[in-house]
């Protein structure tokens, strides 16, 4: 089942992202999901399921393994996999998105911008979650990049697991 993300009012302390899943966000429950780009067929994954600090993320065929199942925590606005957070790492366009220990770092905070049936994930640094060179091939790295209104490599579909 696809999940769309909506931005809630800026004053909402309980949940800045709302999942269209019965009560998931309102209850503050973490939600497990796969993340696919516009056009589908691929998912973001941790290469080789190697959940270690500074490990970059990449695109791969969707397969529902633990390496592709992320958890969104609406209270912290963190996207996690294993016990690590997805981190914008550095904050410059082209920096690879990596895993790091969860904390209060701005690079670990992700908000969303609904774009029709898709969602952009925007880091607190103002850069978007992006596929390098727009490639959806296996192994294509995930990076942060300047947000654009017509960037298909920044539009994501969330599949609930």
Where are these regions (language model features)?
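Bacterial N-terminal signal peptides that target proteins for export
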Residues: 1-13
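Bacterial N-terminal signal peptides
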Residues: 11-21
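Sec/Tat signal peptide C-region and signal peptidase I cleavage site
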Residues: 22-26
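Lectin-like carbohydrate-binding module/patch detector with strong preference for beta-trefoil
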Residues: 27-161
